[in-house]
């Protein structure tokens, strides 16, 4: 667990006693101050930078196992129990006790919102290295592969929807491993045979206090806030999901659930994971369009329009009249391929890259229940509208770009994300036919 100080607390020595005192908003929130002994002061000072609770414990073990004489000269005010630990030369059981004491200290300060859990970059030396993994509390359970992107899932297998089954990838030998066997980054690397680009950890517990930061969007279904650690995401309409945290690059997300209703939790997680995947996919040059799709003459055609506009009606008519296969009943993922296998994170096809647009299969398909794991070239896009008679209307280039962009469900939390979606829509308008079909 990575931890860091909360903003709004300062350490003050008053008449020889060390106090951790709140200020600013923490006072307005009626947060309390606490007294720290010398060990607590040492731990607080070490937390100037974020670290794991294990690393913090090791620092304290090293601190107490330093030169014995020097330690006795400078630690006159340490509690008798701590002196005994030093005098016993830090026996293994004493070191274990110190580690337990540190974890208890951390948990107490987390409960008081003096410390906070944080998401830490997995490989600070190379954040783009796809072989890097984030340490997780929960065991590895499944690996998904969608459009060449591999997503490792951690937590309880009983919470993973069967709707992911067709997209499961055997990329690990970690099946059946206990939590203790998969705690460190190096251990996780050993268990995962193939590089994963994204990790999602499902935790059945409450989260510690986190500052919300700047609210980017808020509606009845989704709340997204941005802080220095990344994003905090809430799902107001979901009862089983408490909240979620995601790094700024989208490579690691933690979803906190109550898990009281397993089936409901499984259903909500399936839909919630889509948001994290689409955020990460957008950064890799993949974009989702709200549309139903058919396979016609080895190319996929998208029918896109507002709800109730007739997407399913059109695709079903094509199936009835021409025997075309329906690829996805609600959502289609588009990327670009130059004929070579995409190497995510290194040779990823961005919206401004060369190549032909490809429709990639993914598990999310609305209520249609129709999804595919296959990928095909994109033939074109048919935008649907209402009219008193059936006819096509020509669209100007700007209309094509804007209307396709408006049919995307790739995130637009920021201006940069909007710009990215517009670039994708402009590339589509240039490379494939886009029609506007009005029907009664």
Predicted regions mapped to residue ranges:
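Phosphate-/nucleic-acid-contacting segments
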Residues: 328
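Hydrophobic packing positions characteristic
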Residues: 1-12
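Long, charge-rich, low-complexity alpha-helical segments
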Residues: 32-139
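Hydrophobic positions on the alpha1 helix immediately C-terminal to the Walker A/P-loop
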Residues: 314
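A noncatalytic interaction/capping subdomain that flanks phosphate/NTP-handling catalytic cores
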Residues: 14-18, 103, 118-301, 307, ...
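Intrinsically disordered, low-complexity segments used as extracellular stalks/linkers
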Residues: 69-97, 177-201, 345-346, 350
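Short alpha-helical segments that sit at the start of domains
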Residues: 12-40
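Conserved glycine(s) of the Walker
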Residues: 310
């Amino acid at each position: 667990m990575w931890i860091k100080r909360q903003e709004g607390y300062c350490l003050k020595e008053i008449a020889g006693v060390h106090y951790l005192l709140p200020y600013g908003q923490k006072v307005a929130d009626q947060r309390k101050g606490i007294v720290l002994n010398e060990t607590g002061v040492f731990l607080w000072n070490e937390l100037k930078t974020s670290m794991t609770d294990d690393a913090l414990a090791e620092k304290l073990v090293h601190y107490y196992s330093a030169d014995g004489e020097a330690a006795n000269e400078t630690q006159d005010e340490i509690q008798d129990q701590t002196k005994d630990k030093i005098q016993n030369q830090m026996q293994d059981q004493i070191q274990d006790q110190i580690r337990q004491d540190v974890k208890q200290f951390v948990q107490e300060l987390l409960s008081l919102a003096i410390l906070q859990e944080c998401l830490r970059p997995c490989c600070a030396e190379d954040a783009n290295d796809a072989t890097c993994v984030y340490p997780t509390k929960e065991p590895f359970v499944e690996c998904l592969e969608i459009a060449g992107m591999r997503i490792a899932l951690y937590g309880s297998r009983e919470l993973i929807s069967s709707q992911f089954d067709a997209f499961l990838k055997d990329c690990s030998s970690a099946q059946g491993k206990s939590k203790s066997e998969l705690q460190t980054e190096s251990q996780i690397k050993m268990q995962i045979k193939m590089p994963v680009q994204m990790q999602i950890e499902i935790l059945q517990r409450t989260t510690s206090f986190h500052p919300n930061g700047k609210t980017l969007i808020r509606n009845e279904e989704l709340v997204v806030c941005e802080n220095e650690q990344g994003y905090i995401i809430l799902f107001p309409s979901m009862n089983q999901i408490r909240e979620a945290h995601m790094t700024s690059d989208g490579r690691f997300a933690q979803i906190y659930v109550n898990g009281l209703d397993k089936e409901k939790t499984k259903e909500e997680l399936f839909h919630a994971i889509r948001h994290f995947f689409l955020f990460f996919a957008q950064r890799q040059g993949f974009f989702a369009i709200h549309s139903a799709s058919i396979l016609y003459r080895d190319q996929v055609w998208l029918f896109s329009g507002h709800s109730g506009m007739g997407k399913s009606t059109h695709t079903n008519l094509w199936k009835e009249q021409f025997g075309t296969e329906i690829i996805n009943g609600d959502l289609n993922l588009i990327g670009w391929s130059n004929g070579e296998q995409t190497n995510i994170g290194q040779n990823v096809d961005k919206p401004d890259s060369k190549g032909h647009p490809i429709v990639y299969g993914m598990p999310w398909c609305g209520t249609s229940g129709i999804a595919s794991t296959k990928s095909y070239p994109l033939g074109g896009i048919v935008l649907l509208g209402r009219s008193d008679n059936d006819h096509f209307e020509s669209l100007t280039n700007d209309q094509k770009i804007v209307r396709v962009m408006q049919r995307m469900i790739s995130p637009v939390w920021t201006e940069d994300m909007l710009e990215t979606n517009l670039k994708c829509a402009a590339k589509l308008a240039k490379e494939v036919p886009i029609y506007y079909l009005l029907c009664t």
